[in-house]
Amino acid sequence: MKVFITGVCGFVGSALAEALLELREGISVFGVDNLQRPGSEMNRGLLRPLGVQVIHGDIRAASDLESLPPADWVIDAAANPSVLAGVRGNGSSRQLFEHNLASLVNVLEYCKKHKAGLLLLSSSRVYSIAQLTSLPLKICGDAFRLDASGTLPVGVSERQCWRRRPRCPCW
């Protein structure tokens, strides 16, 4: 089975690629990423030895998807994950729309063309900005980390997902 992951070098995309290859035999993974986020190049280097083909591209451009090989399944993990994107002057609402919604049209066209199934992932955009900005954070180098005494009794954190690849030297 061939799996195509958008945003393959991001936090979620790279973790999914690694997990799929570890948990199931007979799966090949390839993905596309615009490599704009911090850590993308690091994740690209970690995916290469696993056999993941990483293609530098942007799913907002239909032409970048047209040249990709067919897949049986698509996992759409590409998004602008910033909760504050388009709010408080952190980028425009149009840019947010293009990254998180308009690009989905191109992914759907790819799925239709190749008769591929689609797993559409959500982003932190579904959470209330007021509640997210009230979470206690600690500064960790050049990143933020949720304070261990935070208010999340359930859910998944980055620390749980990054088994061998910590994002922050504090872990």
Could you say what each language-model-derived stretch is?
Residues 1-171:
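N-terminal Rossmann-like NAD(P)+-binding domain of SDR-like oxidoreductases, especially those catalyzing
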